[in-house]
Amino acid sequence: MNRRAVIGRLSLMLGGTIIGAEFFLSGCKSDPEKINNLFNADDLALFNEIGETILPKTATPGAKEANVGQFMALMVNDCYSPEEQKIFTNGLTKLNDRCKEQYGQDFRTINAAQRTALLTILDQEQKKEAKNNQHAVHYFRMMKELTLLGYFTSELGCTKAMRYLPVPGKYIGCIPYRKGEKSWAT
């Protein structure tokens, strides 16, 4: 065997190894869109839009800036029971279906006034269900609670929406409060 034949066969084997490995490893890639077991990046964006509709940006940052979508996904995935997770995920589907029914678009593409109107209706429905003492929690109540909890426990919520005094600070047992002032975060 001469040197040219050996080099030709080696390059063929090496090329086949590289191409074969790339083909084999292409099946090992995970879906980059997946956030956790239940939600993907589109769901996260939807959570942020729901949160921003509930707590919009004003003189203080809104829920989207506090990234409540990430908080909601984490809490539902890690802290909710399978039954509660099912209520929540089915609720997302119901929300988008209802939105498409009323406006012909999904929640993320309708305007702010339409979002507010839809969430106001859902809020009224969940209040009626709570008054009727129905056992299952309404999915919108879960979304609203998670939005508020995520926002007011975030750094932006604590430092920008409420008064914040970093610890350690001196203890003042009685602080005068005037109506309309921010409440204390700590």
Task: Name each model feature, range by range.
Residues 23, 28, 63-69:
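Short alpha-helical hairpin
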Residues 39-45, 62-63, 133-139:
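Structural motif
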Residues 49, 67-186:
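Mature-region segments of soluble proteins
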Residues 7-26, 111:
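N-terminal export signals
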Residues 54, 58-67, 181:
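Long, well-ordered alpha/beta core segments of mature domains
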